[in-house]
Regions:
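Short glycine-dipeptide loop
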Residues: 1-3
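Rossmann-like dinucleotide-binding domain for NAD(H)/NADP(H)
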Residues: 5-102
Length: 102
């Protein structure tokens, strides 16, 4: 096999037990994960396969990233409170509801 699976998205996107089986049976060459189905716990089967790299999900734990996150949140909040267009909504489907209420 030549496939390598990488999951840095969210736990639950990948079935950890099925992935461990695929790695053990060499249907997948390797995997790299920093999120897990049952976070914060790692599926025990993943701990037994040598062709997986498991790391903590801490990519956003830098001063620069946390400042950017705070700025983004503040920009969204100010826009929402002043009636301006929210620049980065997580649920844009609700914006027309807000507009229709005046």
């Amino acid at each position: 096999p030549s496939a390598t699976l990488t999951n840095i998205a969210r736990g639950g996107v990948v079935d950890d037990a099925a992935l461990a089986a695929a790695l053990r049976e060499r249907r997948i060459a390797a995997a790299g994960l920093d999120v897990f189905e049952g976070e914060p716990k790692v599926h025990p089967d993943l701990l037994t396969v040598p062709n997986v790299v498991l790391t903590p999900h801490i990519a956003s734990a830098t001063v620069a990233t946390r400042r950017a996150m705070a700025s983004l949140a503040a920009d969204n909040l100010i826009a929402a409170l002043t009636g301006a267009t929210v620049p980065n909504p997580l649920n844009p489907q609700v914006l027309p509801l807000r507009a229709s209420r005046g």
